[in-house]
Amino acid sequence: MFPKPLVILAHEIYGVNSHMKKMGRLIKMAGYDVLTPNLLGEDEVYTLKEEKTAYEQFTKHERLKTGETIIQNVIRQNAGRHIFVIGFSVGATIAWKCSSMPEVSGSVCYYGSRIRDSLHHMPACPVLLFFPNYEPSFDVALLIKKLREKQHTHLEIYQFDALHGFANPDSVYFNRALFFKTLSIIKNGAESRLRTVSSSFF
């Protein structure tokens, strides 16, 4: 009997907050195993109001780099089962980079701003990118244009009329309808991927 597919959640700069816990519960209800590694210090977590401090700590301790290593190690430790990585913001950049690993069946990236620094990356599995309409730190439309010019076979890009945080129930920019729309897209993509992979064994 095959083990359940595994979803690894890569959190934002805030740590394993209530948003990540809610997301984990939703994914478990859908029949998946879930792991949410803490990419910060032990029990370190920030509220959305502590964004400045969270960002300073994340940058100071180079947690994008160490976080990528942590997620990659978790992936390797669970090799042999279907693994999906879902990341938010900086976690989305990690999910994007992990999509080249042979152990990964699919990656989902919510508003991954730093993907713009890794345009050379070549996904080896299906990847879903969810972007807002606007980001203060970069030109979303330009990034999408550059990604589409790469003509990645496995890449699907969605841009919504919403702002960063539209998939976070704790954010003032939360958009319930769009959030559940993305969950539907993820569910359909994951089920399609599992059917495709499973059929190759029979």
From Swiss-Prot:
GO terms for molecular function: hydrolase activity. Disulfide bonds: none annotated. InterPro entries: AB_hydrolase_fold, Dienelactn_hydro, Dienelactone_hydrolase-like. It holds the Pfam family DLH. SUPFAM superfamilies: alpha/beta-Hydrolases (SSF53474). Belongs to the dienelactone hydrolase family. This is Uncharacterized protein YczH.
